[in-house]
Amino acid sequence: MEEHYYVSIDIGSSSVKTIVGEKFHNGINVIGTGQTYTSGIKNGLIDDFDIARQAIKDTIKKASIASGVDIKEVFLKLPIIGTEVYDESNEIDFYEDTEINGSHIEKVLEGIREKNDVQETEVINVFPIRFIVDKENEVSDPKELIARHSLKVEAGVIAIQKSILINMIKCVEACGVDVLDVYSDAYNYGSILTATEKELGACVIDIGEDVTQVAFYERGELVDADSIEMAGRDITDDIAQGLNTSYETAEKVKHQYGHAFYDSASDQDIFTVEQVDSDETVQYTQKDLSDFIEARVEEIFFEVFDVLQDLGLTKVNGGFIVTGGSANLLGVKELLSDMVSEKVRIHTPSQMGIRKPEFSSAISTISSSIAFDELLDYVTINYHDSEETEEDVIDVKDKDNESKLGGFDWFKRKTNKKDTHENEVESTDEEIYQSEDNHQEHKQNHEHVQDKDKDKEESKFKKLMKSLFE
């Protein structure tokens, strides 16, 4: 049986990440990754086309070497910036008894895309909430059911500004690969939540380099999403100003000594930094450093609370899930736990080689790709035999972990701080993960699911450009 590999690209403000993965039982097996740091992206968008393109190209090459896969087609993750989330429905009719298949599902979903009448936006994701067969039978997956009259879908829709979409896809396809489809972070975050969290109402907070993204899920579905232009870079700027040192030095000490919860920071960890206006070096403690970090991270969380209040939310019973590169900072969980009465957890992907919060978007893009391929019946998944341990595989389906319930006292400002120390996952500089599988074996066995069709489907970019000029 053919092996089907999924390649995702995450274009972030500080780095570009690529993951090559495959479906493995109910999870994803990571074959290889690549990561390249870049200055060509600002606030999650293309700032310098040439620099960004080179970073994407380098990252694809690293992932290709690590996995032994010749990468030709990719799935692209898009940021929440410039997006709108809303609900829509569509219905198709049948004039005889019909067994529903993936083509019918694709048709009814495509009808929702065609209903978008805002010229400056493009619908990028339509995620089914429920299907209704013959106006009465509500189901989550109608494949193989017999419909006598109709198939209706009630779905959530994510649309993005066309200029953002075009430039992101153009930059990726300039690297010699085709973008098969795109997935918004707003939708992707659903794969990092447990079923209980999604049902009760959970808030995902992705703190990146330039942007903090927020998505709220409730009753199993995405409710809304937004972004805040305040994130890790602002933390570093505050450190540089507070310690009177360079940005580069501030970034270094943030990663080595940073702590986001003042009461748990140490006054015994001492470091020295050079001053920007003299040749002198000055000593500081981790507690001194934490004073600047805590203030900014706290401000980011208050901005998140404002977003939730704008949505009319007074409870987040499923808790807060923090991820993204800045979630690596020690004390982030402790600080947020001190500000809210609901549970807080840091999300880190479970697979070997990507066990860092900054890989959450890239791996969840693969989860989204697999979910839609299975819904539309595009692929028959090969469940590989493997010696990999369970901890190396992240669930594609929602996990039914028990979440902490309890009253939600809205968002508390800081009161009595705890003295407990929360060890977060530390970031490393690893750029390439190479699996134990032999590279040559992957090259010989690899054949992408779309490559078997001689009449290859046009890329997302080519389709979009055609539509603009029709």
Swiss-Prot record:
Q: Which organism is it from?
A: Staphylococcus aureus (strain MW2)
Q: Does the keyword Cell division apply?
A: yes
| Subcellular localization(s) per the UniProt record | Cell membrane
Q: Which Gene3D superfamilies match?
A: 3.30.1490.110, 3.30.420.40
The family line of this record is: Belongs to the FtsA/MreB family.
Assembly behavior: Self-interacts. Interacts with FtsZ.
- Look up the record and report any one GO term of the cellular component aspect: cell division site
Classification via PANTHER family: CELL DIVISION PROTEIN FTSA, CELL DIVISION PROTEIN FTSA-RELATED
What is the protein name stated in its UniProt record? Cell division protein FtsA
Q: Which CDD domains match?
A: ASKHA_NBD_FtsA (cd24048)
Protein purpose = Cell division protein that is involved in the assembly of the Z ring. May serve as a membrane anchor for the Z ring.
